[in-house]
């Protein structure tokens, strides 16, 4: 990972937009600090298209798409798009309703199995708003020991589901999307960007293991300082890293992009 200050001017000037994670990237321990929100508006006012890419549920995306200076949100780690449409929002699910219902039944069975194996594992407080996955709190409101997390991950695999892990949540899903495939589909279907060009025209900012697909897919990638805690889980680390963590690091990344443009 290179220092943020080494971002080349021509690379910054070639960007049309910025994709960004929420928890522990834009948000600081769940809070949207002022410098991070100001940075979003600075990027927007400079003409960059902004898209949030998060493991959070689509209900979060509906609020963000209405109130923030973004084109929309890629939620559920890629499965559901939420986009601004006039004065309202529209939701685009990658699955049809029958498939979604079937997968929800299997996820409910998985939740019961995990409850038997690791009774202290708690579902996240936003799980009722989720359509495509279930999530356990491993670091947001409680810290689940690593050995217990491993047991949950093993149970997810035995149920033929897929697990992903952020800095705060452990996700289980039967969907095949990840953040990169969901983001590229959003850029293509909602913004009209050709996927091959989008990976160089859009940058990504993240901090954790479930950001790995985007760190690998996009040319220009940034990590806030706390990404160093997740480097061992990343096959491809971000290209540039900020000196500060979370929202303050995001603000520094935004400022560097704008300074070089």
Regions found by a protein language model. Give the residues of each.
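Residue-level marker for buried hydrophobic side chains located in beta-strands
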Residues: 18-20, 73, 204
């Amino acid at each position: 990972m290179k220092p943020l200050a080494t971002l080349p001017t021509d690379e910054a000037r070639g960007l049309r937009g910025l994709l960004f994670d929420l928890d522990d990237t834009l948000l600081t321990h769940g809070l949207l600090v002022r410098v991070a929100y100001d940075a979003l508006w600075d990027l927007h006012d400079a003409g960059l298209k902004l898209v949030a890419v998060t493991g959070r549920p689509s209900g979060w995306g509906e609020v963000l798409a209405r109130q923030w200076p973004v084109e929309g949100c890629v939620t559920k780690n890629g499965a559901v798009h939420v986009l601004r449409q006039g004065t309202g929002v529209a939701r685009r699910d990658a699955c049809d309703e029958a498939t979604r219902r079937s997968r929800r039944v299997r996820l409910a069975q998985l939740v019961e199995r995990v409850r038997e194996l690791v009774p202290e594992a708690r579902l996240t407080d936003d799980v009722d708003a989720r359509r495509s996955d279930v999530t356990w709190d491993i670091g947001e409101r409680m810290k689940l020991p690593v050995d217990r997390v491993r047991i949950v991950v093993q149970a997810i695999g035995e149920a033929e589901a897929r697990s992903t892990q952020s800095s705060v949540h452990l996700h289980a899903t039967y969907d095949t999307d990840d953040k990169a495939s969901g983001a590229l589909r959003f850029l293509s279907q909602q913004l009209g960007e050709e996927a091959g060009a989008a990976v160089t025209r859009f940058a990504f900012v993240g901090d954790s293991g479930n950001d790995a697909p985007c760190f690998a897919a996009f040319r220009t990638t940034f990590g806030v300082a706390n990404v160093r805690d997740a480097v061992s889980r990343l096959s491809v680390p971000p290209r540039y890293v900020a000196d500060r963590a979370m929202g303050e690091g995001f603000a520094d990344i935004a400022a560097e992009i704008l300074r070089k443009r």
